[in-house]
From Swiss-Prot:
Tissue expression remark: Spemann organizer and notochord.
Record's function text: Binds directly to activin and functions as an activin antagonist which plays a role in neural induction. The short isoform is a more potent inhibitor of activin than the long isoform. Specific inhibitor of the biosynthesis and secretion of pituitary follicle stimulating hormone (FSH).
InterPro entries per UniProt: Fol_N (IPR003645), Follistatin/Osteonectin_EGF (IPR015369), Kazal_dom (IPR002350), Kazal_dom_sf (IPR036058), TB_dom (IPR017878), TB_dom_sf (IPR036773)
Organism: Xenopus laevis (African clawed frog)
Protein name per the record: Follistatin
Main location: secreted
Lineage: Eukaryota, Metazoa, Chordata, Craniata, Vertebrata
GO CC, any one term: extracellular space
Disordered: region residues: 321-341
Subunit-level organization: Monomer.
GO molecular function: activin binding; calcium ion binding; collagen binding; extracellular matrix binding
UniProt keyword terms in alphabetical order: Disulfide bond, Glycoprotein, Repeat, Secreted, Signal
Gene that this sequence comes from: fst
Length: 341
């Protein structure tokens, strides 16, 4: 009698449990992906055994889902050999509730697919003219710079208004920053460190290219900043009255080059390999010789032991005009690391 009463209840509980288990499996089955490629396949696996609802609740554009519950070996083959998983279902078909993050907005493209595009808020920008970025490039306005920042240069910022210049003339730096022309003859706005600790070791002394001994790298950077143009490092240690490069001891990997104009030597790296030069890379050096590039000029200096410096870009026979490029091909070093040139 007892068994007859319990058996129907047990069957009911087993049936309910089985239904819940199958429902759980049906909801959980599937894989969540972070993006959908141009070929329509899902890429960058986020999690397995995830329902579409859970996968798509983030609101992130690009998140996609596949229904197939397949072993890891199949997922591996899809990702490595087939460019992603087939039957990819994008979470977002429209821009509704899409979160693109700051400085971006969702927009339907020509294929009627939602895409996040750069759309910085430029409504509060008062200066409408060109600006010079900290990358040494000129942008037509601050809004264009913000778009470039959005597209992959997160550290990009405005350093001063107007086109990037080769001199500090007419450069108005914001706040307490000062204009400095670096060793590549580009003007930058930097904050001068006016307090340097006193040297505690003779190893901290540096000889500048101006023949002055500085207490440390901090003191040399400070002098550079206050002067408004690069001084550069001649060699480590206090400056000496050298008669030739034989009197100067360079650190490993450097060679002494003699500056005959001032009767001083400086240590320089001489292991640079020069790549293929472009026609607009030519420079006129201090020996009035045209070199295919600044690198080639440095190689010539290293081979002769005589210091060469750039007089101006282009051929020595060309007419030099004070022009300002809209954009530089190469991004100059604006960190003011002390170098030998």
């Amino acid at each position: 009698m007892l068994n007859e009463r319990i058996q129907p209840g047990m069957i009911f509980l087993l049936t309910v449990s089985l239904c819940h288990f199958m429902e759980y499996r049906a909801v959980q089955a599937g894989n969540c992906w972070l993006q959908q490629s141009k070929n329509g396949r899902c890429q960058v696996l986020y999690r397995t055994e995830l329902s579409k609802e859970e996968c798509c609740k983030t609101g992130r554009l690009g998140t996609s889902w596949t229904e197939e519950d397949v072993p890891n070996s199949t997922l591996f083959k899809w990702m490595i050999f087939h460019g992603g998983a087939p039957h990819c279902i994008p979470c977002k078909e429209t821009c509704e509730n899409v979160d693109c993050g700051p400085g971006k907005k969702c927009k339907m493209n020509k294929k009627n697919k939602p895409r996040c595009v750069c759309a910085p808020d430029c409504s509060n920008i008062t200066w409408k003219g060109s600006v010079c970025g900290i990358d040494g490039k000129t942008y037509k306005d601050e809004c264009a710079l913000l778009k470039a920042k959005c597209k992959g240069v997160p550290e990009l910022d405005v350093q001063y208004q107007g086109k990037c210049k080769k001199t500090c003339r007419d450069v108005l730096c914001p706040g307490s920053s000062s204009c400095v022309v670096d060793q590549t003859n580009n003007a930058y706005c930097v904050t001068c460190n006016r307090i340097c600790p006193e040297p505690t070791s003779p190893d901290q002394y540096l000889c500048g290219n101006d023949g002055i001994t500085y207490g440390s790298a901090c003191h040399l950077r400070k002098a550079t900043c206050l002067l408004g143009r690069s001084i550069g490092l001649a060699y480590e240690g206090k400056c000496i009255k050298a008669k030739s490069c034989e009197d100067i001891q360079c650190s490993a990997g450097k060679k002494c080059l003699w500056d005959s104009r001032v009767g001083r030597g400086r240590c320089a790296l001489c292991d640079d390999l020069c790549g293929e030069s472009k026609s607009d890379d030519t420079v006129c050096a201090s020996d009035n010789t045209t070199y295919p590039s600044e690198c080639a000029m440095k190689q010539a200096a290293c081979s002769t032991g005589i210091l060469l410096e750039v007089k101006h870009s282009g051929s020595c026979n060309s007419i030099v005009e004070d022009t300002e490029e809209e954009e530089e091909e190469e991004e100059p070093d604006y960190s003011f690391v002390i170098s030998s040139w």
